[in-house]
């Protein structure tokens, strides 16, 4: 330390590592620090001993669970949309060369007390008990409308301006039933509550198109992909990108204290008696607690199991969405399961997560509907934590603070936050219009 | 072309900052040397095909990208390594003393299934400096340390002059291959995120 940097990044969460990578590639001199001796911060993946230490206060996990290093338990479980923004960031930065991905086996939704597969093919759609025959016809028309919709081609609009017409009104035009609306809004458009029904329909339609594109991309059983060895690989991959372009890394730096000048602008960061100077600081909320405000709590159960989640056709990786209305809640609940097939557990073991926004003072009890879907559980842990968002003015103090990760099992909000921060920090917009087909063509050369 | 299956071997290079890890990699893969020292920038992993007897190996050689400077390599860097190369500078005693730390760090992070027999190779680099006059680590001392750690193969190299670099990497390749498990390990079928299939067209144009 005792050097001068343009940007100091604090915390090696996924958002911070993506930004560190992007800024280093841009030629900025970046110092990246973390108080932990591992990468990932709150979005890390823990091995078994780390898991035991964090949740049980013990150094060693029971031997019968297998080797500690075989476990990579996500602290922020999410799947990636195969055509989503995070994939575009990975391709844009060429970080895919450090990672391996596998498709997620299935996507399910909890409707009327049952776990139902979200159809991945027209054949599955025809057989699905989610809708009756006539409802399927109506839904088919709606899906065709969404598929054909092109903002620039008025012929596809059918006389509706989706920037003004609400989702509710759009759906009403097709005469769909309540349960179908629930299923589409939450399991296809991936909204986490019902607020979208009263918003312009454009966003929902775009989300549905993304779902269909992601489904088609690898033609797996779901639109999702997930990295081998768990999500903790992602921060490490972006950190390596940053390092390759000159970023300096310091893990295990306790008490990173942000220093300010008399005008209140950031001037540097002090740790272990040494101060590094900088013009800007990028960090997660835990490094600047006086500049953030609480915006909610996430409740999560983490389970180690020896079987797939029941009623998911023996899926080794799966998401189950429990829409709020089905549970009588304000926001959705998410069940996420992965296993040895993605190298996050030893052979025969599965890791499952149940996540939602906490709405009461008893979050563990709130998780019970999701836990009930898991079947027998070998070990169960609870992680309840607050979410924060920044309240500072970055143009005044040059501090750029990320928002805490939400409870959803997908990355859209994560990348949006990163892109917004990147623009605030650099004044530039990141062009993510990766032509996936061009990427394929380039590879064949 | 040989009908034998090509073998991909991951090799990682560890050692203190400034001992010449990147230069060794560049000398071996690209036949280049740069005198200008900058804590590693731009080095990533490089691949090179190596033919030994009638067998072709693809070496994937991972540099630390400078993250070793403040002990900040992640577990992902170590995962799946088939051979670990430990590099020190024969003119810097501390870099030799730290080999023990690097070896132990590797064994902790990589957790190989057979730690006693995991293949290491040690390189004593920069033998060219001052024509050998500023050397402080004797060959004898280095060989003794290697012998005490399970007879680790030892080479004295000069990345600048290219001395002994090829011989070292041939040994690295052979030892890495010996470590490759006979039976295929469990390999999930991964997908190509950067490439991907042509999207299925929706609706015909007719």
UniProtKB/Swiss-Prot annotation, chain A:
Statement: the UniProt record of this protein carries the keyword Signal: no
Q: Which regions form coiled coils?
A: none
What are the recorded GO MF terms, alphabetically? GTPase activator activity; Rab GDP-dissociation inhibitor activity
| Gene Ontology BP terms | protein transport; small GTPase-mediated signal transduction
Does Zinc-finger count among this protein's keywords? no
Cellular component terms (Gene Ontology): cytosol
InterPro entries from the UniProt entry: FAD/NAD-bd_sf, GDP_dissociation_inhibitor, RabGDI
Query: Which ranges does the record mark as transmembrane?
Result: none
In what tissue types does this protein appear? Expressed in roots, rosette leaves, stems, floral buds and siliques.
Family to which the UniProt record says this protein belongs: Belongs to the Rab GDI family.
Q: How does it assemble?
A: Interacts with the GDP-bound form of RABA5C (via C-terminus).
Kindly provide the name given to this protein in its UniProt entry: Guanosine nucleotide diphosphate dissociation inhibitor 1
UniProt source species: Arabidopsis thaliana
Its taxonomic path starts at:
Eukaryota, Viridiplantae, Streptophyta, Embryophyta, Tracheophyta
From Swiss-Prot, chain B:
**SMART domains xref list:** RAB, RAN, RAS, RHO
Residues that coordinate or bind GTP: 15-22, 63-67, 125-128, 158-159
Does Disulfide bond count among this protein's keywords? no
Q: What's the protein name?
A: Ras-related protein RABG3d
> What does it do?
Intracellular vesicle trafficking and protein transport.
Family statement: Belongs to the small GTPase superfamily. Rab family.
> What highest taxon heads this organism's lineage?
Eukaryota
Indicate where this protein resides in the cell. Answer: Cell membrane
**Residues recorded as bearing Cysteine methyl ester in the entry:** 206
Indicate where a lipid (S-geranylgeranyl cysteine) is covalently linked.
204, 206
Family matches, as PANTHER family: RAB FAMILY (PTHR47981), RAS-RELATED PROTEIN RABG3C-RELATED (PTHR47981:SF44)
Write out the GO MF terms.
Answer: GTP binding; GTPase activity
Q: Which GO terms describe its biological process?
A: protein transport
Q: How does it sit in the membrane?
A: Lipid-anchor
Q: Where can the motif Effector region be found? A: 37-45
Keywords in alphabetical order, please.
Answer: Cell membrane, GTP-binding, Lipoprotein, Membrane, Methylation, Nucleotide-binding, Prenylation, Protein transport, Transport
Q: Spell out the InterPro entries in the cross-references.
A: P-loop_NTPase, Small_GTP-bd, Small_GTPase
- Cellular-component GO terms for this entry: Golgi apparatus; nucleus; plant-type vacuole; plasma membrane
